[in-house]
Swiss-Prot record:
This is one of the proteins that bind and probably mediate the attachment of the 5S RNA into the large ribosomal subunit, where it forms part of the central protuberance. One of its GO terms (molecular function) is structural constituent of ribosome. GO terms for cellular component: cytosolic large ribosomal subunit. CDD domains: Ribosomal_L18_L5e (cd00432). Belongs to the universal ribosomal protein uL18 family. Keywords: Ribonucleoprotein, Ribosomal protein, RNA-binding, rRNA-binding. Residues 10-20 have a biased composition (Basic residues). It comes from the Bacteria. The keyword rRNA-binding applies. Gene3D superfamilies: 3.30.420.100. This is Large ribosomal subunit protein uL18. Residues 1-24 are annotated as: Disordered. GO terms for biological process: translation.
């Protein structure tokens, strides 16, 4: 019998491949996204120092109830505001191996509208 492909393993493989080609610096940190079944998490990471500079997720109090896409828009806004407050205006977007569609696209568009350039 043919086994069904594990979508998460395929995504992780895609993410490893992309991460080999991009990394965040102090000048232009990496905006990383993790999407779970229930929430979405975003971090601005300086890979050289190995430090998270700003983060936001659906676990934050500012994120109210709504659809997952609406929550992703709020998370994008929060992470952009927190990054801009720390003097970060340009980032490298790391979609985490996910397709640029739906919640990932909503978060990215919201972050762009609130001051991040990528």
């Amino acid at each position: 019998m043919i086994s069904k492909p594990d979508k998460n393993k395929i995504r992780q493989k895609r993410h490893r491949r992309v991460r080999g080609k991009l990394s965040g610096t102090a000048d232009r940190p990496r905006l990383n996204i993790f999407r779970s079944n229930t929430g979405i998490y975003a971090q601005v990471i300086d890979d050289v120092a190995g430090v998270t500079l700003a983060s936001a997720s659906t676990l934050d109090k500012e994120v109210s109830n709504g659809t997952k896409t609406e929550q992703a828009v709020v998370v994008g806004k929060l992470v952009a505001e927190r990054a801009v407050a720390k003097g970060i205006s340009e980032v490298v977007f790391d979609r985490g191996g996910y397709l640029y569609h739906g919640r990932v696209k909503a978060l990215a568009d919201s972050a762009r509208e609130n001051g991040l350039k990528f």
